[in-house]
Amino acid sequence: TMDETKTDRSSMMAWNFSVPDFFSYANASKDNKQFTHAATKKRLVGAFGEFRASWKNMLYLTVSGRNDWTSTLPLENRSYFYPSVSGSFVFTEALQRLGWLDDSVLNFGKLRASWAKVGKDTGVYELETALWPTGTYLDGTVGVGNTWTRGNDKLKPEMTKSTEIGVELSFFKNRLHIDYAYYTNDSYNQILAPRGPQSTGYIFWSINAGNVYNKGMELSISGTPIQTKAVSYTHLRAHETSA
């Protein structure tokens, strides 16, 4: 896949109009107007592969991988790979084959687990410190200065590692469903722009600094206590905790 994003932005400002209340760019002298133009271009190329396998409606496995090449990171870091793997085991299918399942009580049960890594690049032109026009001063002289953010040519891609394990259960001919999951998310090398000392000539600095870890549990219970040909009532209750 290839994703290319382009922006092209122009703006005009004018003040101290020659004719009052006539708001036109042409109604100002060259010393009282400013024109700016900005263009950006970003390209992201990705390659993706996936493998799926199953065995006797009991075991399922999915393995995938993606590699991205981005134009917004330095040459040594612009290629990054992130894989994922997930699997599940329908244990009620195994119990049924062995003759150990009473499906009038438990008619479906599945264990699942997954691990994934996801990469992310950054915005355009964050590697180098650019110049931009600051206005017209001193008898028409055009002013040029640094942008507010100092570039960083050592930036790395952001990464997030996620894991999840869970179980799904259905009872009494699918009248009662329980779904439980425990998950973790670990994000590191986050690209931030914290404030720095203005004595350096910049206000913000682009760096890899953020690291966020959280974990949590999700539980949902749904049931159909009343089910007839004429009436059906289903109730769902969900709960989530995270830290």
Regions found by a protein language model. Give the residues of each.
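Extracellular/periplasmic, surface-exposed regions of secreted and cell-surface proteins
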Residues: 1-236, 242
